[in-house]
Design a protein with these regions (language model features):
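Positively charged, helix-rich recognition surfaces that bind polyanionic ligands
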Residues: 1-172
Length: 172
């Protein structure tokens, strides 16, 4: 089983094998496109309106392309490691701090992984993300104090690792 932890800060996805994809690329371009739209909307002309639509199309295309690439690499990671299942966080239960844009990106990523994995006979499941970042993937001890930012240190067995990697191991 390949576990995939999804995040809103730092990493888009981290797998239980340690593979990592940054969300900063998407966040950077989202802000750039927001600036371009705002600048064009201030003009109010028909030309500006048409350009706002083109900017939206470029933005959507860029994001879809990146998510396709990440999905392909996640599936390749599963194939290389002999995984018959890819377990991702259940997006219906994902954290309340997600805005609509992140929600869109994660749902699309899940769909892309699902159809690409099908080509390899790999099943994709959604797992409850509750406490995955607080549960030790080594001994199973769950405590809020186990995680501090990006660091994970189990208060019971002393296991230490990156918090997102630990969470990905718990998802899978």
């Amino acid at each position: 089983v390949l576990g995939v932890d999804l995040n809103t800060r730092g990493s888009l996805a981290v797998t239980s094998t340690g593979a990592y994809w940054s969300i900063e690329y998407l966040n950077h371009w989202r802000k750039e496109y927001e600036k371009r739209r705002k600048s064009l909307q201030e003009h109010g002309s028909r030309y500006a309106h048409e350009n706002v639509q083109r900017v939206g199309e470029k933005e959507s295309g860029r994001f879809k392309n990146y998510l396709h690439r990440v999905a392909k690499e996640i599936v390749e990671e599963a194939v290389e490691n002999g995984c018959s299942v890819i377990a991702m966080e259940d997006l219906d239960r994902i954290r309340d701090d997600l805005n609509r844009w992140h929600d869109w990106a994660y749902r699309r990523l899940y769909r892309y992984v699902e159809y690409k994995a099908e080509e390899w006979g790999i099943r994709v499941t959604q797992e409850n993300p509750e406490y995955t970042s607080q549960r030790c993937s080594n001994c199973g001890f769950t405590h809020g104090g186990n995680r501090s930012g990006t660091s994970f240190c189990c208060q019971k067995c002393g296991y230490e690792n990156h918090a997102d990697y630990n969470a990905a191991k718990n998802v899978g």
